[in-house]
Amino acid sequence: MLTEGLSIDAKGGGRFGAHLQLPARGRGPVVMVAQEIFGVNPFMTEVLAWLASEGFVGLCPDLYWRHGPGIEFDPNDEVQRARALGMFRDYKLEDGVADLRATVAYAASQPFCDGGVAVIGYCLGGALAYEVAAEGFAQCCVGYYGVGFEKRLERARLVKTPSMFHMGTNDHFVTAEARQLITNAFEANPAIALHWYDAGHSFARASSPNFSPEATRTANARTLEMLKRMKPIGTIGQ
């Protein structure tokens, strides 16, 4: 069952909402879902349902709350897409990292948390998953077509958390030069698994013109394999 209306204390004051989806047994390892640039939209709730069907607790915080509660955009509407891109340009990654840290603390204190706490992010959320991996406050990090990695390559050396990143070789946000830089930096760290797919940006969202069922199936299978190896809270680097 999808639960809305949760409220999480933010660092520095304020509160933000989150969507929660429990597995059939009512508890399990927690996977935070970090949104695309389009907010907590139907795709994010689809991801929550998928995770719950696999035995995980899905928890998706509203990372745009500083601009207003419950903001979401339709990626297939040109006007809304432009607004989402504008919000992304103004978004501060450090705010997202702080909110995900607060979400980890919230999740770890709840009776539904039985195991570790991981993060899966898409697009903007993929970039945040990379930052969380570098900060080391989740037990597992997965990013789908994260943006801007080539601007923060030095962070790759800091990653000790088991991490996995799924990228498309046809992603228009990632140049050929950036692909090589990302590959070199990520493959130098054994904690990071990097996978490239013959696909474009947003290949895992069914409503995207770049949707690739084959890439999505493979990426999701690899993600689940990593999540099922996740260690309990407090065991990073052990």
Swiss-Prot record:
Active-site residues (renumbered): 123, 171, 201
Entries under InterPro entries matching the protein: AB_hydrolase_fold (IPR029058), Dienelactn_hydro (IPR002925), Dienelactone_hydrolase-like (IPR051049)
Enzyme class at the top of the EC tree: hydrolase
Reactions catalysed, as given in the entry: 2-(5-oxo-2,5-dihydrofuran-2-ylidene)acetate + H2O = 4-oxohex-2-enedioate + H(+)
Gene Ontology molecular-function annotations: carboxymethylenebutenolidase activity
Top-level lineage group: Bacteria
Pfam families in UniProt: DLH
GO BP annotations listed: catabolic process
Keyword Hydrolase attributed: yes
Entry EC no(s): 3.1.1.45
Residues in the signal sequence: none
Keywords tagged on the record: Aromatic hydrocarbons catabolism, Hydrolase, Plasmid, Serine esterase
Pathway assigned to this chain's UniProt record: Aromatic compound metabolism; 3-chlorocatechol degradation
Miscellaneous comment: Carboxymethylenebutenolidase is specific for dienelactone and has no activity toward enol-lactones.
The protein's assembly and partners: Monomer.
Function: Ring cleavage of cyclic ester dienelactone to produce maleylacetate.
Homology family: Belongs to the dienelactone hydrolase family.
This protein's name: Carboxymethylenebutenolidase
